[in-house]
Amino acid sequence: MSDTLLAFDFGTKSIGVAIGQRITGTARPLPAIKAQDGTPDWMLIERLLKEWQPDEIIVGLPLNMDGTEQPLTARARKFANRIHGRFGVTVTLHDERLSTVEARSGLFERGGYRALNKGKVDSASAVIILESYFEQGY
């Protein structure tokens, strides 16, 4: 077991990606994947899985601030189920509330408005989702 995890920040146009190690509790962004109405290029996902060979995949679960589901919640669940169904890897959903806000803030601090491109924000959100998962002791 390599203790490598891959995280996705699901979106309808762009899906953020991060890779992390359970042993260090750290994650780093990978290039975001473009999506067509929430459907990714599955061959790109397959390549990521072959390259990184994660033990587990974490998919951010978008919830409202009060914990209730929103329209994107069901789509993120469907994305997670499809990954599990296609590739047979363990997939865990993890609360992603405020991850995009935190990602935008961090990127802006480091590079101003120029740093706020969509793919960077989505992958930075995936890093935050994965690090939050590690912080909760998983």
Swiss-Prot record:
Its main location: cytoplasm. Its EC number is 3.1.-.-. It holds the Pfam family RuvX. GO terms for cellular component: cytosol. InterPro entries: RNaseH-like_sf, YqgF, YqgF/RNaseH-like_dom, YqgF/RNaseH-like_dom_sf. Keywords: Cytoplasm, Hydrolase, Nuclease, Ribosome biogenesis. GO terms for molecular function: nuclease activity. CDD domains: YqgF. GO terms for biological process: rRNA 5'-end processing. Could be a nuclease involved in processing of the 5'-end of pre-16S rRNA. Belongs to the YqgF nuclease family. This is Putative pre-16S rRNA nuclease. It comes from Salmonella dublin (strain CT_02021853). The lineage of its organism: Bacteria, Pseudomonadati, Pseudomonadota, Gammaproteobacteria, Enterobacterales.
